[in-house]
Regions:
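Histone-fold recognition with a strong bias for associated Lys/Arg-rich disordered tails
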Residues: 1-165
Length: 165
């Protein structure tokens, strides 16, 4: 658009602009917002208009830089395996074309627990690790069912978080 034309006319290298300005802004973006965006993308990928805890799990893995990701990675949970398990749990749909993507009531509860966890730790924003702790606090969630099928339980995750922190 117009901004691109102005940048081009000023002779500013588009890659340099991205490197110097956009990436640092993205790094300041709270990781949980990135995870939410990735969770929505995962829901769309399998034709769903609902984001549940299982999509949060995929979002954490897809984000790939957080402490929560490191814990899951150390437990040898890969995106490929996690996607396969989640796809088997929820199946494919064609819903997302019709509606805006919404969060399940359990996903909202997990976000609320994550916010309380962050607040109780005197943090100004929710981190992925708060989200992961909130997920494992919901033993009947689809995310925990997926983790169970991947051979990981809440105790291992808590232990992993304590080991990294």
């Amino acid at each position: 658009g117009l901004a691109y034309d102005i940048i081009k006319s000023l002779g500013i290298n588009n890659e340099k602009l991205s490197e110097d300005i956009l990436r640092p802004i993205e790094k300041q973006m709270p990781e949980v917002l990135t995870i939410m965006k990735l969770a929505k993308e995962e829901a769309r990928r399998i034709g769903r208009n609902v984001v549940g805890t299982e999509m949060f799990l995929l979002g954490i893995i897809a984000e790939g830089t957080s402490v929560a990701f490191e814990v899951l990675n150390d437990l040898e949970i890969t995106m490929k395996d996690a996607r396969l398990v989640v796809e088997n749990l929820v199946g494919y749909g064609n819903e997302y074309f019709d509606k805006e993507i919404i969060f399940t009531s359990r996903a909202k509860r997990v976000l609320e627990k994550a916010w309380l966890s962050a607040k109780n730790s005197n943090k100004s924003k929710i981190e992925a690790v708060d989200l992961l702790l909130a997920i494992i606090d919901e033993p009947n969630s689809l995310a925990m069912k997926a983790l169970d099928q991947l051979g990981v339980d809440a105790v291992e995750i808590k232990h992993g978080i304590q080991g990294i922190r």
